[in-house]
Amino acid sequence: MGKGPLSFRRLSSIRHRKKGSAVKDDSAQTSTPSSPPPPLPIHAGGSAVGATGKAKKKTGGARLWMRFDRTGAMEVVECDKSTIIKRASVPARDLRILGPVFSHSSNILAREKAIVVNLEVIKAIVTAEEVLLLDPLRPEVLPFVERLKQQFPQRNGNENALQASANVQSPLDPEAAEGLQSELPFEFQVLEIALEVVCSFVDKSVAALETEAWPVLDELTKNVSTENLEYVRSLKSNLTRLLARVQKVRDELEHLLDDNEDMADLYLTRKWIQNQQTEAILAGTASNSIALPAHNTSNLHRLTSNRSASMVTSNTEEDDVEDLEMLLEAYFMQLDGMRNKILTVREYIDDTEDYVNIQLDNQRNELIQLQLTLTIASFAIAAETLLASLFGMNIPCPLYSIHGVFGYFVWSVTALCIVLFMVTLGYARWKKLLGS
């Protein structure tokens, strides 16, 4: 009996404690969707930090990433795949696409909350609030980082706090949602910068290839040598690799342009706004259903569901994929122009090879004609040698006893061989075996 009141007080204090923690959890959950995502849970060394403050051991698959959000805040960290998967809500196979095995492939993949971008040297995961860039310190990636800094200048803490408070107070304001959709979304701005950097990088490579190609090909037409042929061979191999790179990026853009559903899936900001509107409507429905009678609750649910469906359909029908389609078409035409330049250089290389082959065929024909002429001359000389050998035998002959017949015999045999040579040569030209 002495422990009764004490136990009752203890239970009541526990209940009060649970209610207070539940209120805190509810407030934390309501403020989470509208606030920007927290920084990556990693320190400068790259390993995760636990609740006790002790750093865990660095995992073997940690790589260098850069986090850049829409407010211009930037941090370079080193983290493993699991951290990125939880942060961006992407499957593990998408991180394999960003790995070294698929370094020469080009992909733009739409996921529920992120876009996986693998374009040449740019490997990133783009969400509606931030971009996670892999290996940001590479020299080829630095122009992309600089363009991000120019496009999204860093704001001070007061501006970020005001924006966060405005989002918390009115996260579902229709005018604010319309303003977000009127300007180009954050993910499309990042995608545009990535395509711009890739096109600029490829354009420089194409210009360098053209500058190197024309003098080498002109020199080859004048002088067919082993050194010039080696230059053209290396030039053609570089051209083939560059054409394959441009073709991969162009094919990826063409694949997106051919499928409106894939382009619609890239609208991360639109999906985020629709989710916020739906959550607000459901929250309003729940609050109103508490005050209304039971027979009016079903009607209210029906009206709110129709309203949410109409808002979602209106948002998706409005400017469906026009902005993204115009963006992709611009860079698709630019890549197509680069591809045409490369094909022009390759056609010129093919024409030069044909010209060199014609020259070599002509020289080969001249050598064959010379060989045939020498063969005819050898035949005539062989006939003269045959006559000389016949009369050089040690056999009785009446011509041996005639004085001074040797000179006439030699000159007559020589003249006969010359006539034989001219007749055979004329016959070969008559049959068009030799040029005129």
From Swiss-Prot:
Region (Disordered): 1-56
Tissues in which the protein is found: Expressed in the whole plant except roots.
Biased composition (Basic residues): 12-21
Ranges of compositional bias, category Low complexity: 44-53
Entry keyword set: Ion transport, Magnesium, Membrane, Transmembrane, Transmembrane helix, Transport
Membrane topology: Multi-pass membrane protein
Localization annotation: Membrane
CC annotations in GO: membrane
InterPro entries found in the cross-reference section: CorA_TM1_TM2, MgTranspt_CorA/ZnTranspt_ZntB, MRS2-like
Major localisation: membrane
Gene3D superfamilies the record matches: 2.40.128.330, Magnesium transport protein CorA, transmembrane region
Motif Required for magnesium transport activity: where in chain: 392-394
GO molecular function list: magnesium ion transmembrane transporter activity
TM spans (from-to): 372-392, 405-425
Note: Has the ability to complement a mutant in yeast lacking magnesium transport capability.
PANTHER family given in the database record: MAGNESIUM TRANSPORTER MRS2-4-RELATED (PTHR13890:SF2), RNA SPLICING PROTEIN MRS2, MITOCHONDRIAL (PTHR13890)
Protein family: Belongs to the CorA metal ion transporter (MIT) (TC 1.A.35.5) family.
General function of this protein: Magnesium transporter that may mediate the influx of magnesium.
Protein name: Magnesium transporter MRS2-4
